[in-house]
Amino acid sequence: MLRLLGRVMSFLPMPPPPPPPPPPPRTPGGPAARQLSRRPCAPPAPSPPAASAAGGEKKRRPPEMLLSSSWPSATLKRPPVRRGPGLGSGTPQPATSARVPPQPSPGRGGTSTTCSAPRRVACSHIPAGSTASGTSAGAGAGPDDATRFSLNLTPEAILVIQRRHLEKQLLARPRRPFPTPSADPRLPLVPCPRTRASTLRRGGPTSVPNAPLAVAVSSRPPRASLLPGGLQATLPSPCPSSLRPVLKVSLLNEKHKYDDEEYEEEVEVVDEGLVRKCTEWLRGVESAAAARGRTGHLDSLPHLSTL
């Protein structure tokens, strides 16, 4: 590789000699301007010393460093990149070191432009995890970093995020407390007006000693439903004292579960054929009982032949 680079360097053309320094600029205006400059109040023009200083710097530079922007010379003369002990060959450089612009040396004018371009391009391919420290600092982050970042989510991920947000909102809402039943088993529940009216209309036992239990059974607390087995779904209380009142209510619900429903009496339909067969059967039985003493056992049952 070094031999190939030496051959390439041998075929490079010789650099031309440095150009002569530019002449000092002439002041416009001709002799009129010269006459004005001879006055004592006019300040001296500072442009000729600056031009002569620039010409002196160009003279001091060596002739071989003026045109050193070719690829072999730039890559050979560039110092190696310094890497920390934790960074390997495959890991990218941090964003803070990549965003710092390289300081151009006084003798290398063209190499700074050729080396800084690939470093800035490689900065955009650094993953988001490594650029987090650089963006949080805010010193080297520019306005183009915010526009460069883009987050693409699938529709399933968007639905999951929305569902979790709704669940958090529902959990954050204050819920109304449920009405707790009284812990004292001796206090009866408040009767429902519908069941009270139906009990009075039917003439139910109100003066019986078991009347409070019947009233307590017929009156169910709000939001309580009967289960298929006749048990009543009671709301959970924070401190259940005993299961005795719940047991009484469940047993009485099983006994009086049809109290709220009213049935109409059906009109009886008489089947004349069935009545006629029954009367004939009864007549045969009577005649058989009358002739029991004079005939045999089978002859006394004439109705069996009709079957």
From Swiss-Prot:
Modification Phosphoserine, positions: 70
Modified residues (Asymmetric dimethylarginine): 186
Low complexity composition-biased segments: 128-138
Keywords: Methylation, Phosphoprotein
Modified residues (Omega-N-methylarginine): 108, 202
Ranges where the record places region Disordered: 1-142
The protein's name in its UniProt record: Proline-rich protein 18
Organism per entry: Mus musculus
